[in-house]
Curated annotation (Swiss-Prot):
Lipidated residues (Phosphatidylethanolamine amidated glycine): 116
Native organism: Coccidioides immitis (strain RS)
Site positions for Cleavage: 116-117
Keywords: Autophagy, Cytoplasmic vesicle, Lipoprotein, Membrane, Protein transport, Transport, Ubl conjugation pathway, Vacuole
Main location: membrane
Domain of life, source organism: Eukaryota
Name of the molecule in the record: Autophagy-related protein 8
Function field: Ubiquitin-like modifier involved in autophagosome formation. With ATG4, mediates the delivery of the autophagosomes to the vacuole via the microtubule cytoskeleton. Required for selective autophagic degradation of the nucleus (nucleophagy) as well as for mitophagy which contributes to regulate mitochondrial quantity and quality by eliminating the mitochondria to a basal level to fulfill cellular energy requirements and preventing excess ROS production. Participates also in membrane fusion events that take place in the early secretory pathway.
InterPro entries: Atg8-like, Ubiquitin-like_domsf
Cellular component annotations (GO), alphabetically ordered: autophagosome membrane; cytoplasmic vesicle
Membrane topology: Lipid-anchor
Similarity field: Belongs to the ATG8 family.
Posttranslational mods: The C-terminal Asn-117 residue is removed by ATG4 to expose Gly-116 at the C-terminus. The c-terminal Gly is then amidated with phosphatidylethanolamine by an activating system similar to that for ubiquitin.
Localization terms from the record: Cytoplasmic vesicle, Autophagosome membrane; Vacuole membrane
Length: 117
């Protein structure tokens, strides 16, 4: 999936911003969170997050649920490189494995358990 954030901001600018964030907040992870295009779930109001390194994927999902005001009975799935990460995994380990060349971790979310084909 194409990232709108990547389309809107040139690589050098993104890279410089991620480096600045990592220097200033060494214990935080710069995350870009965007909705899977064809999903009927609510669009998030904020794409950029600075999450604690020791936050779990499950805790991050909770943050996203609150931001989009998702009711408890509705499902939400997040993807990193088109794969569902383990709920108990730390954001720091997901970041180390999947961070983009620009230094950001790109996460997409959907109301469906499939990666929008």
């Amino acid at each position: 999936m194409r990232s709108k954030f990547k389309d809107e901001h040139p690589f050098e600018k993104r890279k410089a911003e991620a480096e600045r964030i990592r220097q200033k907040y060494a214990d935080r992870i710069p995350v870009i969170c965007e909705k899977v295009e064809k999903s009927d779930i609510a669009t998030i109001d904020k794409k950029k997050y600075l999450v604690p390194a020791d936050l779990t994927v499950g805790q991050f999902v909770y943050v996203i649920r609150k931001r989009i005001k998702l009711s408890p009975e509705k499902a939400i799935f997040i993807f990193v490189d088109e794969v569902l990460p383990p709920t108990a995994a730390l954001m720091s380990s997901i970041y180390e494995e999947h961070k983009d060349d620009d230094g950001f971790l790109y996460i997409t979310y959907s109301g469906e358990n499939t990666f929008g084909n």
